[in-house]
């Protein structure tokens, strides 16, 4: 309709909530399913959109990864590994698609919301949120709005930045 594609945000993701210590809680099909959505899906989207993005001349791809891919934490080992792979793929795609397309990733930490509360269990969610708000340097956690703001920053600005991942965690990595 508009004849161009200036931005692509790969925000689809999935997980299976399994404690990292529960090695029997995940099997090969769990890994394949999680990788399919979290890594292969974004690759296929970029591959399908690359010509339109390059034709724009100054396009941006933003992959939504996770602090799990930086720190090896999160809902499951498969999820952490998939988000680490997405961060690495972000760097590879930045090399391939430049100079016409910038490719970056945002890596949210704990995100406030019902989805996470349901996955973690309300008690664990509230305890984690309270801990992070008390101990992180910024004394707050991510919100969907703060994630969107960072994605928009990569799309509308940061014209010299590609191949990077931005951790959105209120300073959690500093603990």
Describe each PLM feature range:
Residues 46, 140-168, 173:
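C-terminal substrate-recognition "lid" of short-chain dehydrogenase/reductases
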Residues 107-118:
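Short, flexible catalytic-loop segment of classical short-chain dehydrogenase/reductase
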Residues 46, 82, 90:
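Active-site helix of classical SDR
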Residues 19-23, 27-32, 132:
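Substrate-binding pocket helix/loop in short-chain dehydrogenase/reductase
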Residues 98-102, 161-163:
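Short, small/polar-rich loop/turn modules that mediate ligand/substrate recognition or access, typified
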Residues 51, 94-99:
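Alpha-helical segment proximal to the catalytic Tyr-Lys
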């Amino acid at each position: 309709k508009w004849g161009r594609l200036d931005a692509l945000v790969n925000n689809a993701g999935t997980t299976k909530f399994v404690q990292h210590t529960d090695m029997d809680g995940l099997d090969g099909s769990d890994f394949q399913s999680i990788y399919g959505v979290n890594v292969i899906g974004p690759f296929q989207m970029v591959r399908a959109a690359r010509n339109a993005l390059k034709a724009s001349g100054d396009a941006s791809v933003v992959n939504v990864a996770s602090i799990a891919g930086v720190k090896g934490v999160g809902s499951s080992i498969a999820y952490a590994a998939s988000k680490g792979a997405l961060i690495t793929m972000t760097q590879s795609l930045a090399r391939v698609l430049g100079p016409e397309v910038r490719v970056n990733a945002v890596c949210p930490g704990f995100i406030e919301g019902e989805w996470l509360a349901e996955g973690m269990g309300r008690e664990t969610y509230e305890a984690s949120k309270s801990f992070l708000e008390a101990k992180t340097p910024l004394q707050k956690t991510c919100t969907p709005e703060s994630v969107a703001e960072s994605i928009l920053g990569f799309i509308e600005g940061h014209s010299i930045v590609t191949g990077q991942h931005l951790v959105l965690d209120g300073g959690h990595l500093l603990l």
